[in-house]
Amino acid sequence: MEGYKSFLVFLVSSLLLGFLGVIFTLVWVLHWREGLGWDGGAAEFNWHPVLVTSGFIFIQGIAIIVYRLPWTWNCSKLLMKFIHAGLHLTAFVFTIVALVAVFDFHNAKNIPNMYSLHSWIGLTVVILYALQLVLGVSIYLLPFARDTLRAALMPVHVYSGLLIFGTVIATALMGITEKLIFSLKEPPYSKMPPEAIFVNTFGLIILVFGGLVVWMVTTPAWKRPREQEIKALNPTVSSPDGTEEGSTITDCSNTEKSDVELNSEAARKRILKLDDAGQRSTM
């Protein structure tokens, strides 16, 4: 089960790094900065890095890889779409609050808005993320779009999602560097005080987290098989007339770990065979 174990290593590593990134952000603002608050001061600004890291980076990363979790392959595709969209919506709400915090802080302190490259790219990627969310729900979650349209737009949907995710991480790295340059005076950033080392390490953590997420979602062997393949691999599915035959296709809570591992590995082998034969669509 080499493929399954490799996936688990990547998955656990990414989750640990993502969670560690959130912890690093909290330690940064609570220990070295002014803490958290909502009074128009620096403590309100500190919500910006905390919410961007936890929502726009960590939760978005989970939303991207949720289809790759083998133990969810017995869940219905519709259920997974709701989970995928729900996680993205949660990340978007976090991001909006983060934007409100930084604009509120700037306005309270008479600091100009939207003058840095960080702010330009940051606002652009938020708008693109909102557009991606609206189009994704309209095309893939609501039952109005044709299957041909969904299949045709899937490569664009995947590419734009990964592009947005990578841009978010790059923008976050720009932002934390900008914050350190502005904030560290005695000693300056160039002298590498403990805060600088700590925050630089935080930047490396979210960078590696993003790399692991992209690797997992672009590895063909770890792709969720189509619904027909899942049913073929699972002998206990409901019959066409609706009679019960021990189906787990819509209930993923009772699947044994050994069955998940077996089915996931068999599914990957099936996917690779289809890829080699040129039979598999972009879905």
From Swiss-Prot:
Heme b 2 binds at R68, K77, H84, H157, K223. Residues 235-253 have a biased composition (Polar residues). Residues 31-45, 104-116, 178-195 are extracellular. Residues 13-218 form the Cytochrome b561 domain. Residues 1-5, 68-76, 143-149, 221-283 are cytoplasmic. One of its GO terms (biological process) is multicellular organismal-level iron ion homeostasis. Binds 2 heme b groups non-covalently. One of its GO terms (cellular component) is brush border membrane. Its EC number is 7.2.1.3. Fe(3+) binds at H106. It is found in: Cell membrane; Apical cell membrane. It comes from the Eukaryota. Keywords: Cell membrane, Electron transport, Heme, Iron, Membrane, Metal-binding, Oxidoreductase, Translocase, Transmembrane, Transmembrane helix, Transport. GO terms for molecular function: identical protein binding; metal ion binding; transmembrane ascorbate ferrireductase activity; transmembrane monodehydroascorbate reductase activity. It is a multi-pass membrane protein. Its cofactor is heme b. Heme b 1 binds at H48, N113, M114, Y115, S116, H118, E178. PANTHER family: CYTOCHROME B561-RELATED, PLASMA MEMBRANE ASCORBATE-DEPENDENT REDUCTASE CYBRD1. This is Plasma membrane ascorbate-dependent reductase CYBRD1. It comes from Xenopus tropicalis (Western clawed frog). The gene is cybrd1.
